[in-house]
Amino acid sequence: RPIMSATETAYVKNTKLYDLRLISTIGFDADDVAAVQKADGVVAAAGSVNADFIWQHDNKERVYRAHMLTDNINEPVLTAGRMPENGSECLIDSSRFSEDMIGQTIEISDSNDEDTKKNFKYSTYTVVGLADSPLYIHTLRGTTSLGDGTLQGFVLIPEDGFDFEYYTELYVTCTDEFPLYSDAYDDYIDTFSDTVESAATASVNARFDRLTSDGKAEISDAENELNDKKAEAETELADAKAQLDDAKETITSGEAELADAKKQLDDAKA
């Protein structure tokens, strides 16, 4: 359990660091976030995404983690510049960069694989400010599966700077007034987490059921369409066969008439 000073505790509270972080294998949508927001004890809930990526800076490839800027949770503290105004702008780690970076661009390196690239709406982002983030209270920035396994810093990007169908994580803050990481806080969070997870699970399961139902309906519609086309094709085939039979009958009748005419001609000659 981390030992936090009064200053750190105040910082965490002022920046609205999350109390719970939920993850779902099928992700979260706006309805899931709204369902969690309505749960007892919830102050704020926000869907988010993050993505590790390789950025070539100063002729070296380093790995950074891009986080989505969220409202009322995990609020950054601007140390220089301004907040992003659109999806192609970003904030960068104030402990890793100087103000000289403001106005420069971050490029999602070509050495990133396609799965990484598709997380980002743009290939470059303009740095408009430096910031601290409550997600990184201490010096270390964490580990990653990319590069040498070490994160060099963070980047903060607005939601419309990412390209995703669902949120990959859901942050929640609660109404408790207990000292952070105290026994009372831990006890409260244990109960609170059950409430929040139940609300999230119910919403996600309902969405999964809808998706499954929609998928089954699409399959049923496709099967019905296939059967209709099959029946239509069989009808057309039967019609074509009937026309062919009629044609054969006409030919046979014509041959008989021709034979009769020939016989009549032969009889006349005799």
Residue spans for each PLM region:
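Membrane transport/envelope proteins' first extracytoplasmic loop
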Residues: 1-270
